[in-house]
Amino acid sequence: MRDGVQCSSKVGMVSEYAPQPLRLAAWCINDSSTIQHEFLHAVGVYHTHTRSDRDEYVTIHWDNIKYRFFRDFCKRSNSLTFKTKYEPRSIMHYSWNAVALDPLEPTISLKVLVISHEEQFLMLYLSHVVI
């Protein structure tokens, strides 16, 4: 691990003979989700919103993304989905306004409503409650 001004990691093994660079700035040390996100990059996991099937689930607002971050939103044609559902709540998915030119506007918006198993159960349970 290296100290830095950002929290970042290369995706996957860089070299058999050199340490894997993992940068954790002071501001992200106390944020366990950011640390987990960067460790997952280090072991080879890409961002969820770069999946080859992402356009079925989200819209990318290119006009609101800071130019230097464009590559973080490019689809990976060879990405493996492992036949899993698209999960916008994944620790590997950017937030709705990540790296936005205008943080009040989205960089990513959902096309479909995603409901967790817990929410599905609650909805089913509530549908059977007699008031």
Task: List PLM regions with ranges.
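Zinc-dependent metalloendopeptidases
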Residues: 1-131
